[in-house]
Amino acid sequence: MATKGKRNIYVGPADHGHAGKPLNVEGKALGVVRPGALVAEAATGIDENAVAATIFGASRLWADKDQQRTKTVDDDWAINENMVAIRARSGEFLNVLVADAQTITKSGTPLSSNADGTLKIAVTPATVGVTSEEILAYSDEIITTSGVTLVRVVVA
């Protein structure tokens, strides 16, 4: 992931309205959690989000990298570690994990949950005969992913 030049998960707000500070959430990692993964809170901790894109109301919570121990976006959180996630606000920019084989041809492409901690190109109501999906973010770069890749997005 870092070979693509991405070193951070939180990139910042669009308007500097929050002084460049993310909203952090701490909790115990319930499994191995990858930085940039879409995660969900449970009573006992935080785990990668396995909720389908057609289930609306998902929290916009992404695993941060372990900055306290100077780790990188390539270093996963281990089971039972006290981890940090970012509760993203609309308009903030993050580098998040996008699933393999996603061809993002324009900036602003809507992205939804892939039910494994990654995002994928969303199915929108304009697609006839399919169920729409909750849009969590919009791409802020053009890329074709080969493997799970960090992609810069703006939170919906």
Question: Model-derived features: where do they sit?
Answer:
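Surface-exposed, low-hydrophobicity beta-strand/loop segments enriched in small/polar/acidic residues
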Residues: M1-A156
